[in-house]
């Protein structure tokens, strides 16, 4: 398994998640938070979008991974925080949410996971 066996990890955030759907399902079952970057927007990453769609509220984050993982339609260029809206739009679409609802959900998850509340 690609997941650490130790269940006492403090922060269970799978940064820049890019593993197969089966790993996503196992990680979610174990209580991990999956963090998605611009690679979720790549045409060939339908399985990654499925993982984002399956992540329940409270187990999903969105990140830039700048200067890497630039979202479509800017793939191949240097990534920067200003482009994160494309990643949010892609994930919101597959989750059947508005971008605003997804952003609020991600904000709540971030605050909880990183102890800001």
Give short role names for the model-derived ranges:
Residues 7-8, 26-37, 54-59:
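Glycine-enriched alpha-helix->loop->beta-strand junction motifs that scaffold or abut catalytic
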Residues 27, 65, 102:
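Conserved, mostly hydrophobic/aromatic
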Residues 1-5, 10-11:
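Single conserved hydrophobic/aromatic residue that forms the stacking wall/gate
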Residues 58-80:
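Short acidic/histidine-rich active-site segments
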């Amino acid at each position: 398994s690609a997941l650490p066996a130790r269940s006492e990890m403090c922060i269970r955030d799978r940064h820049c998640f890019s593993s197969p759907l089966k790993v996503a399902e196992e990680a979610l079952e174990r209580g991990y938070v999956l963090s998605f970057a611009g690679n979720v927007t790549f045409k060939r990453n339908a399985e990654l979008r499925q993982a984002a769609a399956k992540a329940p509220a409270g187990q999903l984050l969105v990140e830039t991974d700048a200067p890497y993982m630039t979202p479509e339609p800017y793939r191949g260029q240097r990534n920067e925080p200003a482009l994160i809206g494309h990643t949010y739009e892609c994930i919101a679409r597959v989750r059947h949410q508005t971008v605003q609802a997804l952003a609020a959900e991600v904000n709540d998850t971030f605050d909880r996971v990183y102890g800001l509340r």
